[in-house]
Amino acid sequence: NEIFEKAFKIHLKGKIKEAQKIYLKLVKKTEKNHNLFFLLATTYLQSEDYDKAINFFNKSIDIKSNFADAYNNRGIALYKLKMYQESIEDFNRAIKLKENYFDAHLNKGISLRNLRKYYEAIQSYQNCIKLKSHDAKIYNNLANVFVELGNYDKALKSFNKAIQLNKNYAEAYFGRGKLFSLNKHPKLAIKDFENTIKIKDDFDFLYGHLIHTKMRICDWSNYESLIKKIVNGVKINKKMIDPFCLLSLIDDPKKHRITSELSFNKQTELPSSIKNFSQLNKIKIGYFSGDLCDHAILHLTLDIFKHHDKSKFDVYAFYSGLKEDKWT
């Protein structure tokens, strides 16, 4: 009807809240329109209210069980809630209903990467290439997977392809810059970070990567303006720089603390208390690190492991990194 069409046009103009109010009034009058519930759910998805989005996508799917777009969008909401396996199940449902559903294949790859199922993610992106070979997002996402697998040559080729397809692709410049920095090509990294800033300068830690890379080669050009930019960002709680890097740049404990708090990613809830524990003859000590390989951290801690009193302690080391060498 006319009211629905009006709401849809408002929605297309990006007036999310205004469209949402009209959709809410309309759903009270009808409970049979799957598109109406889908669009209402989408406004909540765009507003980052993911629980409500899922609730209304559910209602849309209840009305039309073969609605591929609803499964895909519900999968996005689940992904945003870090329910990666559940999101993959929805993307699979969407793909089953619409085999050549590009967005669902792409979204599935992103969720698989977050579960560290890298080879399955690569397969999803390869399916995307078959459907839309000139989409730069695919190659950028592929590059990020190859970086995590340590396959830097393939990562570089994929970043290059993404940038070739989209000269203004800030994410690809930033990713390639980090790769160049990792591979000890600081001048190329600096160029990519600066290109990123020209296009889009609000990536987390972008300015920190730039100034740290410049410091490595004693490039002090624009040093004061970069410091000012970083400090001003930290003041408004933006993720500007790694806390350890900031320590070497300014003497300001308050900003050091803010940077540390912003960098800390709370993965799990802390246990309230340990009520029951077994009585053991030895105390078990576990060391967790992603650097227990041929890395300075391991070599600096080897003596700690060696000098524990084995009659009193059982010592365990848990390696969470990807690199494999003779030390892992």
Regions found by a protein language model. Give the residues of each.
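Alpha-helical solenoid repeat scaffolds of the TPR/TPR-like class and their adjacent stem/linker regions
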Residues: 1-328
